[in-house]
């Protein structure tokens, strides 16, 4: 009698066979991705060819390490193991490693990461920083023993001696290189005495240069506060670091030239030209000042200083004339008054009154005489005082006595409060004048 197996028993048997079969423990398989829809964790899809289909699974940890994203219709080569899923009685391949078929995985990864970062805007020109014209200290992230650092040091020393080079010895290829490059870029940005950063290495295969295509390095360059020059490989080599850097140089020598756009010779030439321009400007200023001084010395005021007080002398003459006229008028008026009073007394005729009025008249006459004398003396003294005051205004008399007169913009300076530092003043002396600049102003404490 035949023995019938349960579905479970058969499935378990088949699973045991699959698990123990050495040919199914590590299977090398090629196929086309089908029914793929990217999930946040594990990836489930199908691998097919023209005649068959097999279910495939990639656990999330493995998928994150692939270095590229699966796409519908992509042909891939995978390594994995075949297993049976008992509840459905189906079998599938659990993929442990995968790479695109034909085109290398690195090329796919390059294009996919480039597309991703481009969409994020990391390569846009608006984020590029201008390189400094004069750098005091330049940081270099590269290998300690490579030709890169030697070429940079030689070129910078030739173009602008005195610029410091600070090397960050860095692993530039192989496992851990990308992390070390990113870490040293961040370290350089922590310093306040760096002006610029050069990252790079010499030529090599795409695998050798791959650290400069890693996302961690690209983002470190993008986040750099310091302007970054990328010099990776030869002129024909292109990395993602070149896209995100502020400038790309084909060689380390070219990078050093970009880092020192102005040479020491350029600076010396510029200084010499500036010196010539300043000398010409000084000569022009002196010429204009000398011409202005010549015009001033030829002015009427300097040639005929007495004209400064001509008006005051005329005023003095007028005052003296008015004073004399006033005195004569007053004397005449008083005489007329005396005559009128005398006439009144004569007309009244009483002897006593006449005598009294005569006495009174005599007193008034004396008083009038004394008052007129006082008034006259006062007017004469005032006229003398005004005359002396006018003479004091004569600058030629002042400087003739050994004094000097300070003038600012044609006005006489009578107080330090009207001056300030760097004011231009003229010192008038007996035998000429001196142009001065105020060095300091000190007010006398009272």
Swiss-Prot record:
Protein name: Exodeoxyribonuclease 7 large subunit
Classification lineage: Bacteria, Bacillati, Bacillota, Bacilli, Lactobacillales
Catalytic activity: Exonucleolytic cleavage in either 5'- to 3'- or 3'- to 5'-direction to yield nucleoside 5'-phosphates
Any one GO biological process: DNA catabolic process
Pfam families for the chain: Exonuc_VII_L, tRNA_anti_2
Family: Belongs to the XseA family.
Function: Bidirectionally degrades single-stranded DNA into large acid-insoluble oligonucleotides, which are then degraded further into small acid-soluble oligonucleotides.
Localization: Cytoplasm
Keywords in alphabetical order: Cytoplasm, Exonuclease, Hydrolase, Nuclease
Record GO terms (molecular function): exodeoxyribonuclease VII activity; nucleic acid binding
Leader sequence residues: none
Top-level taxonomic group: Bacteria
Organism: Streptococcus pneumoniae (strain ATCC 700669 / Spain 23F-1)
EC number: 3.1.11.6
Known partners and oligomeric status: Heterooligomer composed of large and small subunits.
Disulfide bonds: none
Enzyme class label: hydrolase
GO cellular component: cytoplasm; exodeoxyribonuclease VII complex
């Amino acid at each position: 009698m035949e023995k019938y197996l349960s579905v479970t028993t058969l499935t378990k048997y088949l699973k045991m066979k699959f698990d123990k079969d050495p040919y199914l423990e590590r299977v090398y398989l090629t196929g086309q991705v089908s029914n793929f829809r990217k999930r946040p964790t594990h990836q489930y899809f199908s691998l097919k060819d023209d005649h068959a289909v097999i279910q495939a699974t990639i656990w999330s940890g493995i998928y994150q390490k692939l270095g590229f994203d699966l796409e519908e219709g992509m042909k891939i080569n995978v390594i994995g193991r075949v297993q049976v899923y008992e509840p459905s009685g189906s079998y599938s391949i659990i993929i442990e490693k995968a790479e695109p078929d034909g085109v290398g995985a690195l090329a796919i990864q390059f294009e996919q990461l480039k597309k991703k970062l481009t969409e994020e805007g990391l390569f846009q020109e608006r984020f590029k920083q201008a390189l400094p014209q004069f750098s005091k200290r330049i940081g270099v992230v590269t290998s300690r023993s490579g030709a890169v650092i030697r070429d940079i040091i030689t070129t910078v020393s030739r173009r602008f001696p005195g610029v410091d080079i600070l090397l960050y010895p860095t692993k530039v290829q192989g496992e851990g290189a990308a992390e070390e490059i990113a870490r040293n870029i961040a370290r350089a940005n922590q310093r306040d005495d760096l002006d610029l950063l050069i990252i790079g290495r010499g030529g090599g295969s795409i695998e050798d240069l791959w650290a400069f295509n890693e996302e961690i390095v690209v983002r470190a360059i993008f986040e750099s506060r310091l302007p970054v020059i990328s010099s990776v490989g030869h002129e024909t080599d292109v990395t993602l670091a070149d896209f995100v850097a502020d400038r790309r140089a084909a060689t380390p020598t070219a990078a050093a030239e970009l880092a020192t756009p102005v040479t020491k010779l350029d600076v010396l030439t510029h200084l010499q030209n500036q010196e010539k321009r300043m000398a010409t400007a000084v000569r022009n200023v002196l010429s204009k000042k000398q011409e202005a001084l010549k015009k001033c010395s030829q002015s009427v005021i300097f040639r005929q200083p007495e004209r400064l007080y001509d008006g005051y002398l005329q005023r003095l003459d007028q005052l003296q004339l008015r004073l004399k006229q006033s005195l004569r008028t007053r004397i005449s008026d008083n005489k007329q008054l005396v005559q009128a009073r005398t006439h009144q007394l004569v007309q009244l005729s009483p002897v006593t009154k006449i005598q009294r009025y005569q006495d009174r008249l005599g007193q008034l006459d004396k008083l009038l005489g004394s008052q007129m004398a006082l008034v006259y003396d006062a007017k004469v003294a005032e006229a003398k005082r005004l005359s002396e005051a006018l003479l004091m205004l004569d600058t030629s008399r002042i400087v003739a006595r050994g004094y000097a007169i300070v003038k600012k913009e044609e006005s006489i300076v009578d107080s330090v409060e009207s001056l300030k530092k760097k004011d231009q003043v003229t010192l008038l002396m007996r035998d000429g004048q001196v142009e001065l600049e105020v060095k300091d102003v000190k007010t006398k404490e009272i």
